[in-house]
Each structure stands twice: as C-alpha cells, then as structure tokens.
Amino acid sequence: MAIQYKRILLKVSGEALSGPKGTGFDEETIASICAGIKAAHDLGAQIGIVVGGGNFWRGRSSGKMDRMDADKIGMLATVMNALAVKDALRQQGVEAVVMTSSLMPQVAECFTSDKAIAALESGKIVVFGGGTGNPIFSTDTASALRALEISADAMFKATMVDGVYDKDPHKYADAVRYDTLTFTRVLDERLAVMDSTAATLCRDNGLPILVFDLGKPENIAKAVQGEMVGTLVKE
C-alpha cells in the first residue's frame, strides 16, 4: 500500500501514556498507542518517536526549584517513558531502540543522526529520550530538532484533541477546527500547536506538522497514508 510519508517523527506527550490514571504508566493505554504505531510501521513507514515526561514531572510547575534542575528531572522522565514505549513495541513484535541526548551507556545508546537513520533504514523504530539534552527547550522543540536531524518527511503531533482550534474546544462549544494552517498564522495568532521555538524551526526548514487525536491510535496509519485526520500545518 502506498504511503505519503515514508519517514516520520511522532511526538507523544507523557500525559498520553498515563491513560485514565493521569500519572505514571497505564500499560493498556501504552499497548493501544503502540498498536497504532505498529500499524503504521507495517505499512512501511520509518518511525522515530519523541516522548514527553509530563506523566511524571512538569518543570514549569516545580515551585521554587531551580529551573535548570527541574528541567533535568523532566528530561530523565522522558527517558523512562522512552524505555516503556520501546518495551511495549517489542512485546508486539516490533524492533525498537532507545537513543538518548546525553550519555547513559547502561541505559540506552547516545543519539547521533547517523546511528538513528541507520536504525530506521534497518526497520527499527527509534524512540528518543532526554529531550534536546539542554534545559529550557521543550520536548516539542526536541521533536522538531530530531525530525530535521533524521530528515523526516513530516512531524506528527499526537494530542488529546483532533486538531488545532481557534480556541479551547473543551471550554468553548463554538470552537472552530482548522483543516490547514500556515506556521506564520500559528505564530502570529499564538495558536496552541507547539511553542514558538519549535514552530519556527519547522517553518524555516519546510517541515510540515500534522496534529491529530491520539485517542484513536489508528489515526497514525491513516496519517501516514495521507488521510486528513487532523490539522496540517505548513508554510
């Protein structure tokens, strides 16, 4: 079956891995998400994944803690999530490897673009942990960076809503969903797609983003085939 996006970077929030529990891991939820990833992989897509850490830690809500230390804790949380996703994929018969932004030789391989691309081309899914390896930068920015480093055709941002809206659809019944947007409009209107650093990276390097609902894991395979399952952002 023909696919539109041969190589993708999938961003999955940490909160998505917690399922109805709201914190930590929910094995059933992770298994469901990974089944959706496997379906896209079975179509022939090469898949890199960046996971957030919000199911364990949110640096911006860390009170009086030093921001640098808080962000480092958050980066470690993403490594835990990356290992959980890798294990869930392997349970479903998919070869996967974790690559981290900082040296953790007893935990995972350290990321280089060459090693990541080689793993993708060999049929493995690569799960990236540790964010960018630097404090301040979000996992959205890490996703944009890794997508560019592996020469992805698109970045898929799997969220808890079915696209980008003009206002919060959970609060406003008259919220309007966009089918397509430009990065310039996203930045000018501060629409809730991702932070401005990540959006600017994608805009300046011609990397499209598809935002869709991870509550329907089958959307990943549909999106790989070019179906409009959410909001497409490109310049």
Q: Could you say what each language-model-derived stretch is?
A:
Residues M1-E235:
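C-terminal catalytic "cap/lid" subdomain
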